């Protein structure tokens, strides 16, 4: 072995006095205070320093190799070893045999090795307690040290046997065996971690004895002393270069094998940790624990393993900012919502106000993102709804028209055989010409127009009822008073109390009358023919005036002709009953003509009134549906918000808002 600072400066003078083997060795040892460092073989993780006290050792040994003794001789010499492991020869002049000297040197070497092993084991145990992460490495090192110690002991035992057998050999053999013993001791001390630096200049058995004694003294002093604060690290290669069995290839192989084992252990630990950690979503920052696996002269490997049962950190997402361009209408809506939320905050407790404010902010931002539909979109929605309503109205109108036709067919009287044919024609005409629905926009129609139409419909109904009642009255009057001879009363109406002048009427009647006299039957026939001619002329005039309503007029003409025939039949019957009165009184003839004209006009008005009734019913339904539609959009039902623009304006106009409804 080699040391930087040798503990003793030795001066050795070797003199070969004679060829026979007389040797004298003198050693003078100065006593400086030095420090030695102990290092481990592969894992030099710790370093211990030992301070030595000053010592003085002077010894003179003289060997006489002239007389060689047998190895079997058991001679006892006066050699004494103290507790401090320093020896002194009582009889310095007396020389010891070689066998005993060699055995002593071997025993001392064994003691030194045992002491070094004990120190190394203690140091390793302390390191194991302090460094938990390096347990595996230290255990490996301890096992290596123990194996090396066992090898050293075996080598020493083998050397003992060799030395006992080789006592009869020359001095050169003795010195060679001493060299081997010293080399084995140096290798063992280097592998266990404690190295002592000794320069071997003399290779005689005396030097072996002295060096062994000095080593024993040094080891005992090392055990009793404390380590100083300052440490000196010794490189790995300096401890090994002086070893004769040193090979760099072997060291590199050992390092590679150690690193492979360490990596395998680390991988196994990481796999175990990963299997234990399950379902981890939230996290904290992992604490890095550095475990020193191997520290050699070439490289150091460190591994970072996360502590188990710790959660990885969450990926903090940076908030993305979106630009929102609110419109004027959305701002108005925001003002409303903000006022409502402020009123709600007053009722919330103080420990919840912060949370409620944050929620309100998020709510308002989301409300800003909601777009308000434009006017074009609203119009398209309204048009679709109107089209659906119109389809429904058309279906309803067709059903109503069919029902009215059936009811009119059943209610009409059938006096003659010709009447059913005429009714069938009327029903066909009504079905072929259905009433077209009124298509008018909502904005153009107001409440006033609706009222005007309703009033007109009501007045027309009242007129029809009055005219029908007047017809019945006039017919009853003619029957009653014509038979009793009370014609003057007929002329006196409630509006006219006096009898009107009848000169012009009589003159016209005289011109029309013929001078020839005829029987009663002939006169009645002539009068009936004249009345029929007048009715035909009136019908022609009405047809010319009403060119637009062709179908209606044709039906009315047929009805009028039937009515006229019925009237003529009745008149014939009445004339047969009261023939002399009618022939004498032309006023009655004029009244009958006027009544017939009124009946014709009423027959023309009735179908038109029916159409007006149907249109009025359709209009009423249309306005009922529109009123329901506007009620939904009014302030009465705030839950159904279909038109947000109008709602916002109405809400802004109303200061008091009931929050309970919302």
From Swiss-Prot:
Domain of life: Eukaryota
Biased composition (Basic and acidic residues): 77-87
Residues covered by region (Disordered): 1-94, 107-237, 288-328, 406-440, 506-580
Coiled coil: none
Extent of Basic residues compositional bias: 226-235
Compositionally biased tracts (Polar residues): 162-176, 203-212
Composition bias type Low complexity, residue spans: 25-49, 109-161, 183-196, 213-224, 288-308, 413-434, 515-526, 535-575
Protein name per its UniProtKB record: Putative uncharacterized protein DDB_G0292292
Protein species of origin: Dictyostelium discoideum
Lineage: Eukaryota, Amoebozoa, Evosea, Eumycetozoa, Dictyostelia
